Amino acid sequence: MTAADWRRTLNPQEQREVRELVGAATEFDAVAPVGEQVLRELGHDRTEHLLIRGSVSGGAADAVVGYLNLTPPRDAQPQMAELVVHPRARRRGIGSALARAALAKTGAANRFWAHGTLEPARATAAALGLSPVRELMQMRRSLRDLPDSVPAVPGVRIRTYAGLADDAELLRVNNAAFAYHPEQGGWTDVELAERRAEPWFDPAGLFLAFGDDDSDRPGRLLGFHWTKVHLDQPGLGEVYVVGVDPCAQGRGLGQALTAVGIEWLARRLGAGDSAADPTVMLYVEADNVAAVRTYQRLGFTTYSVDTAYAVPPAAN
């Protein structure tokens, strides 16, 4: 790659080729090379795209063999890059070329996600002088043998999502709970609408906890648990997002909401069927010790780790 051809938009053919590239890498590595938000951005002009075309061993001579997505600057958060190289076009320096292009564009200020922290990603990071700066753990547990009862929280009632009328409170709590978070914080109606449009969205799997006693304003949202059923992976559910208003923390609300959602996923995915073996997954920041311990108490164990790499501050 002699010059980086950054693009704000991709045409439908290019979007299709990138999705096929991601699918090929996912099948080969048994882990998706980019997050779901990258795929969501393919049809928009909110991020920047970088494509590398070339030959695929035993395949097309002019295929998209490398792709990188770069988020725009946002508040004080570093830009994030995610990239993928076709399994049959690796060991040609494509990944390094994409990464160097991103570093050149951002003045070496961006980060790179390495999903699954696979050996090729670790080797590329080392060759570029990048160091781990953030770890995101994926934890899983079986949906069998769940606790018999969900812990109740006094003065709180939990119901499912009732539609657009819930959105203002949902956004308020989400943005208060994740004010620090580079991906989950700062949501608007756009982010909610995009997720409602996803094939997996089910209002019956979005649980909202409201204050229902004198200590809280009735009707005020205290927390929520958004679950997800992975339609492309039968038997897999996800604790997609659990958010609790900082004013309501310390009451066991997060654990109660998590348990309610997991119980629903177990019913939804047929945990009572002797032939089924459903599983629930979640993501948690590795340095969030309290949350990790909470999930461990709920029976979750570490399944994989995603690592964000960056140029060390002294070298930047």
From Swiss-Prot:
It comes from the Bacteria. Residues 16-153, 156-316 form the N-acetyltransferase domain. Acetyl-CoA 1 binds at L83, V84, V85, R91, R92, G93, I94, G95, S96. InterPro entries: Acyl_CoA_acyltransferase, GNAT_dom, MshD_Acetyltransferase, Mycothiol_AcTrfase. GO terms for molecular function: mycothiol synthase activity; protein-N-terminal-alanine acetyltransferase activity. One of its GO terms (biological process) is mycothiol biosynthetic process. Coiled coil: none annotated. Keywords: Acyltransferase, Repeat, Transferase. Acetyl-CoA 2 binds at residues 242-244, 249-255, 288-293. Transmembrane segments: none annotated. It catalyses: 1D-myo-inositol 2-(L-cysteinylamino)-2-deoxy-alpha-D-glucopyranoside + acetyl-CoA = mycothiol + CoA + H(+). Pfam families: Acetyltransf_1. SUPFAM superfamilies: Acyl-CoA N-acyltransferases (Nat). 1D-myo-inositol 2-(L-cysteinylamino)-2-deoxy-alpha-D-glucopyranoside binds at E36, E183, K228, E238, Y283. The keyword Repeat applies. Its EC number is 2.3.1.189. Catalyzes the transfer of acetyl from acetyl-CoA to desacetylmycothiol (Cys-GlcN-Ins) to form mycothiol. Belongs to the acetyltransferase family. MshD subfamily. Monomer. HAMAP family: MshD. PANTHER family: L-AMINO ACID N-ACETYLTRANSFERASE (PTHR43617), MYCOTHIOL ACETYLTRANSFERASE (PTHR43617:SF31). This is Mycothiol acetyltransferase. It comes from Mycobacterium avium (strain 104).
